[in-house]
């Protein structure tokens, strides 16, 4: 590979990475308006099955927000999360979060249940729910 080709490939890579991060969605964890704020560590504990006082809600496995949420919150990818929940379910130590079709369904379920928590796009937040944490 000559220098000119390498320089072009490097430029394409930089542009691709820059555009990829520029379009990242803002994700927030939400709860019932009466809920107290949670730290990211507390949220991770709920979504990893370590805290059963709250009821975590998931979006569909095929939804891009789901993979993004778990990666940002726990550092784990979708396959790792799925395997972890399969293990917890098999051993009787937990039950995977209930899947809902989209952010509106999550928001509606969270608004109706004081123990439920979920995640949605920041732009979808309204007065029916409370932002518990920003997921960066």
Stretches with model-predicted labels:
Residues 10-13, 22:
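Cleavable N-terminal signal peptides
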Residues 24-136:
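Flexible loop/hinge segments at secondary-structure junctions
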Residues 5-7, 19, 29:
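Generic early N-terminus positional signal peaking at residue ~5-7
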Residues 1-11:
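Bacterial N-terminal signal peptides that target proteins for export
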Residues 18-24:
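Sec/Tat signal peptide C-region and signal peptidase I cleavage site
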Residues 2, 15-18:
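Low-complexity intrinsically disordered segments
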């Amino acid at each position: 590979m000559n220098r000119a080709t390498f320089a072009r490939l490097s430029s394409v890579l930089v542009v691709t990475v820059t555009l990829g991060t520029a379009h990242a969605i803002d994700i927030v964890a939400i709860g019932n308006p009466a809920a107290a704020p949670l730290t990211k560590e507390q949220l991770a504990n709920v979504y990893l099955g370590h805290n059963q006082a709250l009821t975590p809600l998931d979006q569909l496995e095929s939804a891009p927000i789901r993979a993004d949420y778990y990666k940002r919150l726990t550092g784990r990818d979708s396959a790792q999360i799925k395997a972890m929940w399969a293990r917890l379910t098999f051993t009787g130590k937990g039950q995977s979060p209930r899947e809902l079709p989209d952010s509106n369904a999550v928001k509606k379920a969270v608004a109706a249940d004081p123990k439920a928590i979920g995640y949605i796009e920041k732009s979808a937040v309204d007065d029916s729910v409370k932002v518990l944490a920003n997921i960066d």
